[in-house]
Amino acid sequence: MGSNKIWLRAETKPAEARSALTPTTCKALIDAGYEVTVERSTQRIFDDDEFAKVGAPLVEEGSWVKDAPKDAYILGLKELPEDDFPLEHVHISFAHCYKEQAGWEKVLSRWPRGGGVLLDLEFLTDDAGRRVAAFGFSAGYAGAALAVKNWAWQLTHPEGEPLAGEKPYANQDLLIQSVKESLQAGQKQSGKSPKILVIGALGRCGKGAVQLAKDVGIPESDIIQWDMEETKKGGPFKEIVEDADIFVNCIYLSSKIPHFVNVESLSTPSRRLSVICDVSADTTNPNNPIPVYNITTTFDKPTVPVTLPNGTQGTPLSVISIDHLPSLLPRESSEMFSEALMPSLLQLKDRENARVWKQAEDLFNQKVATLPQTA
């Protein structure tokens, strides 16, 4: 079951520059006796040469399908390209098919059909039930950055032109500088700083959103931090609609909860809210607590307008629902994630005796058992 072969596949999602391994963690695995193969990539934040220099052989993008040894772990981040061929390898990635997302049966059924296994990164947990590695902080940070930019953009583009596309930033300082410039332009128009309300503020993702707000100079008095205590009475919450300019949703959705906002609550003439950033991006989840949009946005087109009933007064309102926000800061987010994942990766040789991987495989088998017969 265990193997010392790891094959880092190239990401195929547009604008996805992150990597499950960095040159540093790749070297640490090689030093520990692992055979690490790296697919070339034109979009990864790390150059191919950086991996070659630490001793990893480079192979062509997508070559894992035909060339990877049967016992190699196929390591990646985002979901595989849509396809139908059965999967025979053990894959380690975020597959987004365990919470009955749209099309989950088609995605998940590829592994049992090929005799392969999915070890989903989203569900790797430690003894206390906490995720061993997550992009939460980076997601919240990037989401809040785009939300502030969108708030300012709406003020400086009153004719309703949507927020321009964004490309990944080489480092965090460049992102902060860009957001500060937008913020100043927005403040010049409005004469004030935006009020930003973060739900899930005590979690990793929420802490990232709050930190961005502080880093770009939004006063603490304008950063409203909510968590389970503030939301336990159940929404919709008029405070989100009437007290905040920007709402950043950072919760981890595990069950049905009352809506935070909905079309009805947003239709009040007292609405102040103009930007929603749904970092959780549970767009197709039937329990989405922000049921005012139905598409996942992209870095090319970061926002989607919210359609309110005819005659509704007030400022424009748009949603950011990008589902790979940490790729806005690919270097820092990859380094943070890969470093946190390392202790688990180092157990892959002896996977059958490693709790984190045994638990991941048990969960895979449980989910496979729920597949409809036709999948």
From Swiss-Prot:
GO terms for molecular function: mRNA binding; saccharopine dehydrogenase (NAD+, L-lysine-forming) activity; saccharopine dehydrogenase activity. It comes from Emericella nidulans (strain FGSC A4 / ATCC 38163 / CBS 112.46 / NRRL 194 / M139) (Aspergillus nidulans). The keyword Amino-acid biosynthesis applies. Disulfide bonds join C205-C250. Transmembrane segments: none annotated. Its EC number is 1.5.1.7. L-saccharopine binds at R18, K78, Q101, R131, F135, S280, A281, D282. Belongs to the AlaDH/PNT family. GO terms for cellular component: cytoplasm. Pfam families: AlaDh_PNT_N. SUPFAM superfamilies: Formate/glycerate dehydrogenase catalytic domain-like, NAD(P)-binding Rossmann-fold domains. Keywords: Amino-acid biosynthesis, Disulfide bond, Lysine biosynthesis, NAD, Oxidoreductase. NAD(+) binds at R130, G203, R204, D227, T231, Y252, V279, I322, D323, H324, L325. PANTHER family: SACCHAROPINE DEHYDROGENASE (PTHR11133), SACCHAROPINE DEHYDROGENASE [NAD(+), L-LYSINE-FORMING] (PTHR11133:SF23). GO terms for biological process: lysine biosynthetic process via aminoadipic acid; protein import into peroxisome matrix. It is an enzyme of class 1 (oxidoreductase). Pathway: Amino-acid biosynthesis; L-lysine biosynthesis via AAA pathway; L-lysine from L-alpha-aminoadipate (fungal route): step 3/3. The active site is at K78, H96. The lineage of its organism: Eukaryota, Fungi, Dikarya, Ascomycota, Pezizomycotina. This is Saccharopine dehydrogenase [NAD(+), L-lysine-forming]. Monomer. It catalyses: L-saccharopine + NAD(+) + H2O = L-lysine + 2-oxoglutarate + NADH + H(+). Catalyzes the NAD(+)-dependent cleavage of saccharopine to L-lysine and 2-oxoglutarate, the final step in the alpha-aminoadipate (AAA) pathway for lysin biosynthesis.
